[in-house]
Amino acid sequence: MAEKEEGKVAAEGGAEAEADEEVEVKFRLFDGSDIGPLRCNAVATTVAALKDRVVADWPKDKTIVPKTANDVKLISGGKILENDKNIAQCRAPFGDLPSTAITMHVVVQPSSAKSKPDKKTNKLPKTTRCSCTIL
């Protein structure tokens, strides 16, 4: 019975430790350079907050520069991260080593590029084309 109690206390302590867990996150840019690492709380920090931080810390000498956080997509573990999730929810199921920083890949897609380009209208009249092949 005492073993069950100890296991329960250890599980509760693990949940508290996870709530206060500080993680290091670094961001890999398109050219292979990095932003960070920065320390943040895994439960309290959302993906949207990370995107804001990436835009604020973006190097000025890059050819591609995001204007807003909506222009940035973060990828971790092969998945595009959703803005409303926190870091703890986005971790890979196998987990990261505690002593290493979590690397997130940054993709910049300007919002103007997301809109579909208008179809170019061809001013030539449409003609019906037929062909016959005799074998």
Curated annotation (Swiss-Prot):
This is Membrane-anchored ubiquitin-fold protein 4. May serve as docking site to facilitate the association of other proteins to the plasma membrane. Keywords: Cell membrane, Lipoprotein, Membrane, Methylation, Prenylation. It comes from the Eukaryota. One of its GO terms (cellular component) is plasma membrane. Residues 23-92 form the Ubiquitin-like domain. InterPro entries: MUB (IPR017000), Ubiquitin-like_domsf (IPR029071), UBL3-like (IPR040015), UBL3-like_ubiquitin_dom (IPR039540). A lipid is attached at C132 (S-geranylgeranyl cysteine). It is found in: Cell membrane. The modification Cysteine methyl ester is found at C132. Residues 133-135 form a propeptide. Coiled coil: none annotated. Pfam families: Rad60-SLD_2. It is a lipid-anchor. PANTHER family: MEMBRANE-ANCHORED UBIQUITIN-FOLD PROTEIN 4, UBIQUITIN-LIKE PROTEIN 3 HCG-1 PROTEIN. Residues 1-20 are annotated as: Disordered.
